[in-house]
């Protein structure tokens, strides 16, 4: 490695923003994190303040450098990974957002999406984008934002308006407003990217009423996007990789060939399988998406993936803490779940933001079923953890059907993986081993690996991946049969929770 001995990863997630420093061996040196406030202006609506995201990003960058006692000149590159689909509009002359960012979990555009479906657009949108027509993705959110900001400010000069997902917003700010760009992995989550061409789709921009001038330039995921303005850290540091968070985790796990897959347990759970250089079309309502892109001899090389997106997993645990006040912190859920022999007949449907794959039911809502006078707090907590494992099984079953050859092992990452009860239950219900790495921040690790490889700090991707340490492999145990029987009961509960909201 050169005299610059660190790579910084910026991991801008749904619940918080983090800066992590990695050394030349790909190991974490230090990190700084700040939880991000969530705004719920109406039921089913979720917003973030983009200025808070940027302020916390700056704070995390400066704090991690101070904590690690390093000179910013030693940072060779920055890799950026973000929550996907969350988007905003801002004024490029003032740098001010025109509205709070609409978060991926937000359902305010469900009726608008249903309208488009009734007009017969569903199949065409899937054919062009690989995505289902759902309020989850950015297209309908940007359409809503544009209508709303024009309503609030009829004299708005649209020539000054630009749009982006969180990577684009962060990049624009990091470069002092010089670069308005995104990468293919984030662009593929907007409902506006033509998946086979890798460019913005004019027909879909027209359909959603979004001017092309709003949209960022699309660049390969690995490569120099720009340099940080010297007013941050006093250095021009290349921003050398951008990934959506799930694609970054896929990259960290070394899933770069057909059939290699991982599951990340964050705010939601996301199971992603690489499909090589071909777009795989699911028969089970999984998404086709870009894994990542890179340039080889001047040509853009695209890797694709299929994905099962489950909207609510870690968010359920957060809700137990903040909404129901059943727990003081996430860590205690493990002990509570283990304190009872079973779930006491209680089942939870984690449809707090509707249901994602494989149901795609925007009207589903969360539910506890099977409650009797004997149900205790421990049973409720256990039911929530079991539900996280059950929904992953649904998606693994769908991937198995699509791929034709059953998955032999599940690689996992994300904060909820710290929960040993959840990981063991996941192995039991799947009937296959679950491999947990020592570094659970695979999203940040993937962004760091990508940036370091892009600027030549590292040359050997396979070697980097091979050096990752495994913490534990959970194997199916004595409770596997019971867990699999409970899964069938849980599927009945899911049917009861579907088609609930208008």
Curated annotation (Swiss-Prot):
Name a Pfam family for this protein: FGGY_C
**EC code:** 2.7.1.30
Q: Which gene encodes it?
A: glpK
In which pathway does this enzyme or protein participate? Polyol metabolism; glycerol degradation via glycerol kinase pathway; sn-glycerol 3-phosphate from glycerol: step 1/1
Catalyses which reaction?
glycerol + ATP = sn-glycerol 3-phosphate + ADP + H(+)
Purpose of the protein = Key enzyme in the regulation of glycerol uptake and metabolism. Catalyzes the phosphorylation of glycerol to yield sn-glycerol 3-phosphate.
State any GO BP term from the record.
glycerol metabolic process
Keywords, ordered alphabetically:
ATP-binding, Glycerol metabolism, Kinase, Nucleotide-binding, Transferase
Identification of the protein by name: Glycerol kinase
Which Gene Ontology cellular-component terms appear in the entry?
A: cytosol
What influences the activity of this protein, per its activity regulation comment?
A: Inhibited by fructose 1,6-bisphosphate (FBP).
Query: Which SUPFAM superfamilies does this entry report, sorted A to Z?
Result: Actin-like ATPase domain
Q: Which residues bind glycerol?
A: 84-85, 136, 245-246
- Organism listed in the record: Acaryochloris marina (strain MBIC 11017)
Q: What class of enzyme is it?
A: transferase
GO MF annotation: an example: ATP binding
